[in-house]
């Protein structure tokens, strides 16, 4: 038997899927292969995501492959998965979470603190751009899209002083050496689910148990809390939303940020990790209470 796993065509998406394939072989002794899918988000690289429908554009065609029974499962970056799935699907596993931090990449090794006044920084993320302005309001934000390699090339092509990328993607691609600096995730909050992988299947799929065996309880605890936070705030690519969460013993600690009435609000919460979804909801309500 060979499971078919749908994924995007980018190098990073394929590397992430290969990690899941290795886990399937190691834990379940099951062979698998990739089904590469071109998504709308990959095709429309000329426009910011917030103008064309948000991050769901990276998953719709992949879900179609599942519906058409062309694949048994799909691997996503959890930060690309909308907070509400269509009723036919479920996230059966969240097998691992890499470094959750954002990373600063510059060709000369400059860090954010020693950049020249008015430096040009590339990012299309509202979350990154707005938080960046809190540190250095003199910086010029330049929208860039594309895969990791394309964005790094744009430092030279668009005369940028640096760009911001997820550390997880760079590490998975073996490109950690291009990182000039890391952002403290408790200060510069990551995207919801950043660094985590998710496996999506049709509900009650015949082979779902193989994928479920790869689930990490701790990863699921943090990511579900963050997604609960995002759901209450109805956040996506159109607004600043970020969260940091960590499990320590029986506790879950979360920090969240969101824009309320054009003001960036940041709050935290601590509680029992078994109440992760409730904690995410309460943190969102705490922020909305600032209205």
From Swiss-Prot:
The gene is hemC. This is Porphobilinogen deaminase. Keywords: Porphyrin biosynthesis, Transferase. It is an enzyme of class 2 (transferase). NCBIfam families: hemC. InterPro entries: HemC, Porphobilin_deaminase_cofac_BS, Porphobilin_deaminase_N, Porphobilinogen_deaminase_C, Porphobilinogen_deaminase_C_sf. SUPFAM superfamilies: Periplasmic binding protein-like II, Porphobilinogen deaminase (hydroxymethylbilane synthase), C-terminal domain. Binds 1 dipyrromethane group covalently. It catalyses: 4 porphobilinogen + H2O = hydroxymethylbilane + 4 NH4(+). Pfam families: Porphobil_deam, Porphobil_deamC. One of its GO terms (biological process) is protoporphyrinogen IX biosynthetic process. Monomer. One of its GO terms (cellular component) is cytoplasm. The modification S-(dipyrrolylmethanemethyl)cysteine is found at residue 237. Tetrapolymerization of the monopyrrole PBG into the hydroxymethylbilane pre-uroporphyrinogen in several discrete steps. The porphobilinogen subunits are added to the dipyrromethane group. One of its GO terms (molecular function) is hydroxymethylbilane synthase activity.
């Amino acid at each position: 038997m060979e499971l078919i796993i749908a994924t995007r065509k980018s190098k990073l998406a394929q590397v992430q899927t290969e990690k899941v394939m290795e886990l399937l072989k190691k834990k379940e002794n099951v062979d698998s292969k990739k089904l590469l899918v071109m998504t709308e988000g990959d095709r429309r690289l000329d426009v910011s995501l917030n103008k064309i429908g948000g991050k769901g554009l990276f998953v719709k065609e992949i879900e179609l492959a599942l519906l058409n029974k062309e694949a048994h499962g799909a691997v996503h970056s959890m930060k690309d998965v909308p907070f509400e799935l269509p009723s036919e699907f479920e996230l059966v596993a969240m097998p691992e979470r890499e470094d959750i931090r954002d990373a600063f990449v510059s060709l000369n090794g400059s860090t954010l603190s020693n950049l020249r006044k008015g430096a040009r920084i590339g990012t299309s993320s509202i979350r990154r751009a707005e938080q960046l302005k809190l540190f250095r309001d003199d910086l010029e934000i330049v929208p860039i899209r594309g895969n990791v390699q394309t964005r790094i090339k744009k430092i030279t092509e668009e005369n940028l002083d640096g760009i911001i990328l997820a550390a997880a993607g760079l590490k998975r691609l073996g490109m950690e050496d291009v990182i000039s600096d890391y952002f403290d995730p408790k200060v510069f909050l990551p995207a919801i689910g950043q660094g985590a992988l998710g496996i999506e299947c049709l509900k009650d799929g015949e082979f779902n148990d193989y994928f479920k065996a790869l689930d990490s309880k701790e990863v699921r605890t943090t990511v579900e809390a963050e997604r609960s936070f995002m759901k209450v705030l109805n956040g996506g690519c159109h607004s600043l939303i970020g969260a940091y969460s960590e499990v320590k013993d029986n506790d879950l600690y979360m920090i969240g940020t969101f824009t309320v009435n054009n003001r960036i609000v940041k709050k935290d919460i601590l509680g029992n990790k078994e109440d992760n979804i409730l904690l995410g909801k309460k943190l969102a309500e705490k922020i909305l209470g600032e209205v």
